[in-house]
Amino acid sequence: MKVAENQKVYDITIIGGGPTGLFTAFYGGMRQASVKIIESLPQLGGQLSALYPEKYIYDVAGFPKVRAQELVDNLKEQMKKFDPTVCLEEAVDTLEKQADGIFKLVTNKQTHYSKSVIITAGNGAFQPRRLELEGTAKYEKKNLHYFVDDMNKFAGKRVVVFGGGDSAVDWTMMLEPIAEKVTIVHRRDKFRAHEHSVENLMNSRAEVSTPYVPVELIGDDKIEQVVLQHVKTEEKVIIDVDDVIVNYGFVSSLGPIKNWGLDIQKNSILVNSKMETNIPGIYAAGDICTYEGKVKLIACGFGEAPTAVNNAKAYFDPNAKLQPMHSSSMF
């Protein structure tokens, strides 16, 4: 095998640590496979954790409603029983099948080897649209935020939210009861969020600054003030702040996945009823994959994960049973 010395070859490597990826990792453990998750974001949970951790989800079986982050936390707790290896802030650049049948995955940090691969990358890698002002980079990971993982850290703070879509309005409304002051800044007079959400915003104690755009951030180690400029009159105002949240949306892309030799249809990976791609040993599940009649829901991804794992197990271990025992008889 062309494997680096002391480099472990995993049974299953999962690309993408969203809800489908987390359940795939758990189920891989159920099949006694060694499992690794590679995730490009700083945390597990995919869009649930990055975009709307405090929102409720209503279409997951067995939950009348469940907060997005709570669902992620439950999935992490579930898979922890089998202790999968987790690699965060790693994006897979190349994926190739070697002559010996082992898959080689090269990321921005290191090289991984695996007997099979399951891609659960959602809509692909996504990154926030960043605030394009001079010097913004030095404030990131301090008090300039593109991801919000814990609302409580904004308690009693003066918070400014940039954006006019659903996420910006939702975050403003969730911060309104706990922040000392929350201001939402949008470059247009009208918001793009749902009408009911906008109505709630207008009836809240949140301050609304429209049509304004940020033109300068002031502060040494952290942002202390934000300079806003009126879009029409060019009048400038200065706001004192403790934290700034940017909600300009996210840019998602399959990126390097398009170069891995997989059959791609409309930015999705084509799979068969085994969740198998056109490359034997590579499978896909969740929103990243497509087939006739495909429905893109978290609940569907949870169903596709065991199919992918069971077929991956049969691929790298032909003596393994495709149909596993029921979990109730295993614990």
Curated annotation (Swiss-Prot):
MF-aspect GO terms: ferredoxin-NADP+ reductase activity; flavin adenine dinucleotide binding; NADP binding; thioredoxin-disulfide reductase (NADPH) activity
EC numbers, comma separated: 1.18.1.2
GO biological-process terms attached to the record: cell redox homeostasis
Protein residues bound to FAD: 20, 39, 47, 52, 92, 126, 287, 328
Cofactor (UniProt): FAD
Gene3D superfamilies hit by this protein: FAD/NAD(P)-binding domain
Cofactor: binding details: Binds 1 FAD per subunit.
Top-rank lineage group of the source organism: Bacteria
Name of the protein this chain belongs to: Ferredoxin--NADP reductase
Signal peptide stretch: none
